Amino acid sequence: MSITKEDILNAVAEMSVMDVCDLVKMMEEKFGVSAAAAVAVAAAPAAAAEAAEEKTEFDVVLVDAGSNKIAAIKAVRGATGLGLKEAKDAVEGTPFTVKEAASKDEAEALKKQLEEAGAKVELK
């Protein structure tokens, strides 16, 4: 009669925590593996998700001026304080970073302002 997976599971369930730790160490040595590597790999996606959630600074990038370039130039001038020629060059030379490291609220407000002028904007 061979031992089934269910028998092994029941035997492990009856062990103390220290005995289970010793068993894990013995299995690592016997099979040449590390249980810590599997844990680190599983934790990596969670850490990446936390980093994405914690993003507080955004770059506001003008991707396209749209059909009304004059309105886009005015919006860029108002947002950046650039002169007329510099704002015109920026709008015509898209993509152009309008504002770097803006707070979420500031970036959203700026994006809304530029989109109302007909421009296509991305937050990065």
Swiss-Prot record:
Q: Which domain of life is it from?
A: Bacteria
Q: Signal peptide span per the entry? A: none
Gene Ontology molecular function: any one: mRNA binding
InterPro entries per record: Ribosomal_bL12, Ribosomal_bL12_C, Ribosomal_bL12_C/ClpS-like, Ribosomal_bL12_oligo, Ribosomal_bL12_oligo_N_sf
Q: Which Pfam families match?
A: Ribosomal_L12, Ribosomal_L12_N
UniProt entry keywords in alphabetical sequence: Ribonucleoprotein, Ribosomal protein
Any one biological process term the GO annotation gives: translation
Gene Ontology CC: one annotated term: cytosolic large ribosomal subunit
Biological function = Forms part of the ribosomal stalk which helps the ribosome interact with GTP-bound translation factors. Is thus essential for accurate translation.
Complexes and interactors: Homodimer. Part of the ribosomal stalk of the 50S ribosomal subunit. Forms a multimeric L10(L12)X complex, where L10 forms an elongated spine to which 2 to 4 L12 dimers bind in a sequential fashion. Binds GTP-bound translation factors.
- What family does this chain come from, according to its entry? Belongs to the bacterial ribosomal protein bL12 family.
Which NCBIfam families is this protein grouped with? L12
Identify this protein by name.
Large ribosomal subunit protein bL12
